[in-house]
Amino acid sequence: MTQVVIDATFEQETAEGLVLIDFWATWCGPCLMQAPILEQLSEEISEDELKIVKIDVDENPETAQKFGIMSIPTLL
């Protein structure tokens, strides 16, 4: 299952291992279209192999700004 992170927990949740970060927003159509694909991927791959996290850019602008996110969806 994908994990939702916020600015306050981002560093802690992404500090170890291989992490795929999904920068998204609730109003973003393409973000909503790719969400089921990322969810399926998270179910097929163990968290030890790849951790998938989501961060809402509207509610967590600090992290989005830190990574220079200019458009969404963006995967890092």
Per-segment meaning from a language model:
Residues L20-F23, L38, T63, P73-L76:
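A short, hydrophobic beta-strand/beta-hairpin element that forms part of a small beta-sheet core
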Residues V19, E49-K51:
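Structural signature of beta-strand start/N-cap positions in the alpha/beta core
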Residues L32-S46:
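Typically the conserved alpha-helix immediately C-terminal to a functionally engaged Cys/Sec
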Residues C28-C31, L75:
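The canonical Cys-X-X-Cys-His
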Residues T14-T26:
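Short active-site neighborhood of thiol/selenol oxidoreductases, capturing the structured segment around
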Residues M1-E13:
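N-terminal "domain-start" segment that seeds a small globular fold
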Residues E47, I55-A64:
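Structural microenvironment flanking redox-active thiols in thiol-disulfide oxidoreductases
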